[in-house]
UniProtKB/Swiss-Prot annotation:
Pfam families: Chorismate_synt. GO terms for molecular function: chorismate synthase activity; FMN binding. This is Chorismate synthase. It catalyses: 5-O-(1-carboxyvinyl)-3-phosphoshikimate = chorismate + phosphate. One of its GO terms (biological process) is chorismate biosynthetic process. Homotetramer. InterPro entries: Chorismate_synth, Chorismate_synth_AroC_sf, Chorismate_synthase_CS. It comes from Flavobacterium psychrophilum (strain ATCC 49511 / DSM 21280 / CIP 103535 / JIP02/86). This reaction introduces a second double bond into the aromatic ring system. Pathway: Metabolic intermediate biosynthesis; chorismate biosynthesis; chorismate from D-erythrose 4-phosphate and phosphoenolpyruvate: step 7/7. NADP(+) binds at R48.
Length: 355
């Protein structure tokens, strides 16, 4: 199985399954002599971990990171950083009923057809538990590029949307509520809706907005490695993501060019930033902002039709511990992947500037 690595200079490879002994990763290309704040890394893990509120999965995992290499006396050595995160609260019996069946909108069927073997326990490698390793890498990436600020937040749940522009939001409020929405009135509505959906044994999707600030001009490699293309790839690699738009996004398709063009000020900044901080695939120094759409979680605590490995259609009820809505826990994952992309391009640009 390929496809387990991302990045050119700052590179992350992840391994492990949802119900295996441990998850882990190897970060290659991290510069030496960076003083790592290990507490900050663990805080990022706490943001992602299950069981943190009544509106997320109740699986209980400490998600403590154990570093194996690449760090000495609190500093990075420039060698590969290896780490593991032990799984301690697996309940594999919750998945015995799907051993011989394929749940709708899961990876069960395609994994078995492609590899002729499938770890059905909690989705195995296709589980969102894999993203714990990405959050570790993202937390380190943030410390590689401390001057670049990355803030993600929930901007919609179902049809409840936060319509304020991000410039009017106080990002410090994002972590003050279970939904991770910086507008408290909207957060309350979203949380109540998720609780209602959970009672029904159903799930709901939503969107996350991410804002990247203090970005230097020049990050991005046309033509195939444009900055927005890599951000899109990184976001679309996250479980349950169904869409990505940056800047004016799909709304820009409805506008006239005379309204959509982004004139320059004399200092090189732009007036509207409908470009979303990227032009020609290269950062222009303005804020980068994008939005990601997440589908409803596919596992329902309701009966639904499934296909068996003998090609029968039967009714089956979902078991186990699952998120009724993934977006609250996906916020640190989005930030992590954004940080990995930005650190990768930052280090690549540094190579150019040194020649």
């Amino acid at each position: 199985m390929s496809g387990n690595s991302y990045g050119k200079i700052f590179k992350i490879t992840t391994f492990g399954e949802s119900h295996g002994e441990a998850l882990g990763g190897i970060i290659d290309g991290c510069p030496p002599n960076i003083i790592l704040d290990l507490d900050a890394i663990q805080i990022e893990m706490q943001r992602r971990k299950p069981g943190q509120s009544s509106i997320v999965t109740q699986r209980k995992e400490a998600d403590e990171v154990q570093f194996l290499s690449g760090i000495f006396e609190g500093k990075t050595t420039g060698t590969p950083i290896g780490f593991i995160i032990k799984n301690t609260n697996q309940k594999s019996d919750d998945y015995s009923h799907i051993k011989d069946s394929y749940r709708p909108s899961h990876a069960d069927y395609v994994y078995e057809k492609k590899y002729r073997i499938r770890d059905y326990r909690g989705g195995g490698r296709s589980s969102a538990r894999e993203t714990a390793s990405r959050v570790v890498a993202g937390a380190i990436a943030k410390q590689v590029i401390p001057e670049i600020k990355i803030n993600a937040f929930v901007s919609s749940v179902g049809d409840i949307s936060l319509d304020k522009p991000y410039q009017d939001l106080n990002f410090s409020l994002t972590e003050t509520n279970a939904v991770r929405c910086p507008d408290l009135a909207s957060a309350e509505k979203m949380e109540n809706y998720i609780k209602e959906i959970k009672k029904q044994g159903d799930t709901v999707g939503g969107t996350i907005t991410c804002v990247i600030q203090n970005v230097p001009i020049g990050l991005g490699e046309p033509v195939f490695d444009k900055l927005h293309a890599e951000l899109g790839k990184a976001m679309l690699s996250i479980n349950a993501v169904k869409g990505f738009e940056y800047g004016s996004g799909f709304c820009g398709a409805k506008m006239k060019g005379s309204n959509h063009n982004d004139p320059y000020n004399q200092d090189g900044t732009t007036r509207t930033n409908l470009s979303g901080g990227i032009q020609g695939g290269i950062s222009n120094g303005m804020d980068i902002y994008f939005r990601i759409a997440f589908k409803p979680v596919a596992t329902l605590i309701q009966k639904q039709e499934v296909l068996t490995n003998t090609n029968e259609i039967i009714e089956q009820q979902g078991k186990g511990r699952h998120d009724p809505c993934v977006v609250p826990r996906a916020v640190p994952i989005v930030e992590a992947m954004a940080a990995i992309v930005m650190a990768d391009f930052f280090l690549l640009n540094k190579i150019y500037n040194n020649h």
